[in-house]
């Protein structure tokens, strides 16, 4: 039993609370948890951030501080924020402090581990490189992902980051068979709800046949959830949504990462874990809010002076060891579509592959709106992907680059003023651009088109046929939202 040390609140400024500890041998340590109860009797967890004076600590709250008052008792728990572990966490939904929020009962008796942990030691890190195929043409061809790597999805508001991350969950988590952890950081509660329902429908989270049947009929009766079946689920959720205070949004990434680390390290042979973060910018944004509230001098564009170190501390824990791997896919919001903003720019340096979503491509109706010229991968070389794949990817990039250079001339003088050779380049580049689009399973309700997963060999074959001029006689419209090149050919034979 932990001997709780009692203090009292002496100041409340929004989510920042100062607590006085009198007549104690030592103050709670940095990152230690304190608890206080609001007028409704709900527990609120505070995390120590600063020692100010001899007897006072400054804390950030993990929940809304409405109803708290000066003079109220606060108790030190003697531990940091921690997450439950064990097979009981499979399929469950947690908040930042490890409490369940899915209505399926608490896990009070489970063993817990701290969310503040050191990265694995250098000698335990793995150096193996394997390609993680996603079934999405533009990703697999021009910016292949690395199993056990860190991947960033960059884009402004409304260009498709969340839809792409949901499709990646659908494609990889289903076909891959490993365990997944999803951290919802400062995003819409509705999206978290939609994702949970999608996971239940697809069988990644197992609520049992009885619940599933009711769900199909529009009901949500959690009393019908099969707890034994739930333990066989392949995904776990941790949410700190946009309506929550900055303390929760700043720590929820670490809470989710702690579960991913547990899955990776908890078995003798280890496991390969998928760790999805939506959205890593909100982690930075919450840190900026807290920094201002704690009185630190802001740096460039108002961000916290500790931006690089906070990001580095978190990203260094997302790594692969000889025991297992964590493949991290992170959505990154780009403020005002400015890639030079300090928040996305700081994230760039930690990533193995970047997928940049473009508003310009989105406006053309090409989805996913990935910009193949701005997107990168450190394994796009013959050494890792082979000669055929590399040459095809380079040819695709070259023709799109040339098309981009010609667009100014086309806008001013018109396409008729181009040389015959450049006209051919433009026509083929437009076909390539449209063939990079693809119908998604998670977007089927919007497009009315069944989602497609495309093998890398079929992808290379299709683009080579376009680049070699074998399909010049097929109109551009037939290349849009198709999977394989055979679908394009079949579509061209039908009357529009």
Curated annotation (Swiss-Prot):
Coiled coil location: none
Keyword Ion transport: yes
The entry's keywords: ATP synthesis, ATP-binding, Cell membrane, CF(1), Hydrogen ion transport, Ion transport, Membrane, Nucleotide-binding, Translocase, Transport
Recorded catalytic activity of this chain's protein: ATP + H2O + 4 H(+)(in) = ADP + phosphate + 5 H(+)(out)
PANTHER family the record matches: ATP SYNTHASE (PTHR15184), ATP SYNTHASE SUBUNIT BETA, MITOCHONDRIAL (PTHR15184:SF71)
Subunit structure: F-type ATPases have 2 components, CF(1) - the catalytic core - and CF(0) - the membrane proton channel. CF(1) has five subunits: alpha(3), beta(3), gamma(1), delta(1), epsilon(1). CF(0) has three main subunits: a(1), b(2) and c(9-12). The alpha and beta chains form an alternating ring which encloses part of the gamma chain. CF(1) is attached to CF(0) by a central stalk formed by the gamma and epsilon chains, while a peripheral stalk is formed by the delta and b chains.
Function: Produces ATP from ADP in the presence of a proton gradient across the membrane. The catalytic sites are hosted primarily by the beta subunits.
Protein's name according to its UniProt entry: ATP synthase subunit beta
Organism in which the protein naturally occurs: Karelsulcia muelleri (strain GWSS) (Sulcia muelleri)
